[in-house]
């Protein structure tokens, strides 16, 4: 029996021993490093938010610049069309005065060049009754309202992203101030002493005074 046990022990594969070394410095660094790692993560998050905010602002500026250039080109084109129409339209004014013994009468005749009649605008010939309407349409076409420059971007998502990023940045950068709760006044909790209540010394003095009075 003893030989068999020795053979079994010799045949078993023994596992290598594990040696654990306790390092006090690493333990202290691990336990006290939670706050440090938290501050580092907070700084990294703030830097990332700043980078994203810069990218969104740059994109917004580029879009506004493109819109401004487009609006400027439209205005220049409208001014060129107005100048061309002003060159084509010629007006002649003739005034004739008639003197009377009591008053003076002046007759003014204004004749404008009809662009539609000269086939300059490519419109059909108007009738005599519609000449006044065509003149009003020409005047209204010349006086086109100018568009205002875009103050905001057409994409509302960019402005929303920028506002949300700035809000989160302010929330991260703001320091938390711990407010201490005011202590409750002790006067409000304590009941005022009653006027009729007397202390032990006062009662003893009263009893001794009565005893002396009775002895006399």
UniProtKB/Swiss-Prot annotation:
Q: Where in the cell is it found?
A: Nucleus, Nucleolus; Nucleus; Cytoplasm
A GO molecular function annotation here is: RNA binding
Q: What does this protein's UniProt record list under function? A: Multifunctional RNA binding protein that plays a role in RNA metabolism and DNA maintenance. Participates in the resolution of DNA stress and the maintenance of genome integrity by localizing to sites of DNA insults. Also plays a role in proper nucleolar organization by limiting nucleolar size and regulating nucleolar number. Mechanistically, regulates the nucleolar levels of fibrillarin and nucleolin, two key players in pre-rRNA processing and ribosome assembly.
Compositional bias, Basic residues, is annotated for 171-183, 200-216
Q: Subunit composition?
A: Interacts with KIAA1191.
The alphabetical list of record keywords is: Coiled coil, Cytoplasm, Nucleus, RNA-binding, rRNA-binding
Q: Which InterPro entries does the UniProt entry name for this protein?
A: Nucleolar_protein_12 (IPR019186)
Q: Name one GO cellular component term.
A: nucleolus
Superkingdom: Eukaryota
Supply the name of the protein: Nucleolar protein 12
The family note in this entry says: Belongs to the RRP17 family.
Q: Where is this region: Disordered?
A: 120-216
UniProt feature, compositional bias: Acidic residues: 129-140
Coiled-coil region(s):
33-97
């Amino acid at each position: 029996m003893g030989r068999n046990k020795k053979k079994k022990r010799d045949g078993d594969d023994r596992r290598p021993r594990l040696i654990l070394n306790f390092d006090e410095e690493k333990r202290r660094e691990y336990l006290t490093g939670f706050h440090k790692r938290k501050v580092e993560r907070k700084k990294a998050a703030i830097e990332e938010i700043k980078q994203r905010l810069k990218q969104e602002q740059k994109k917004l500026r580029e879009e506004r610049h493109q819109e401004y250039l487009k609006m400027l080109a439209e205005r220049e084109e409208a001014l060129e069309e107005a100048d061309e129409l002003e060159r084509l339209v010629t007006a002649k004014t003739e005034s004739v005065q008639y003197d009377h013994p009591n008053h003076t009468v002046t007759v003014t005749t204004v004749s404008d060049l009809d662009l539609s009649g000269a086939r300059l605008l490519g419109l059909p010939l108007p009738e005599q009754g519609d000449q006044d309407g065509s003149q009003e349409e020409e005047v209204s076409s010349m006086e086109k309202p100018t568009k205002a420059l875009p103050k905001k971007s057409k994409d509302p998502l960019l402005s929303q992203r920028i506002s949300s990023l700035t809000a989160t940045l302010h929330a991260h950068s703001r320091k938390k101030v711990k407010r201490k709760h005011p202590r409750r006044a002790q006067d409000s909790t304590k009941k005022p002493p009653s006027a009729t209540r007397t202390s032990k010394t006062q009662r003893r003095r009263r009893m001794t005074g009565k005893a002396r009075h009775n002895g006399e």
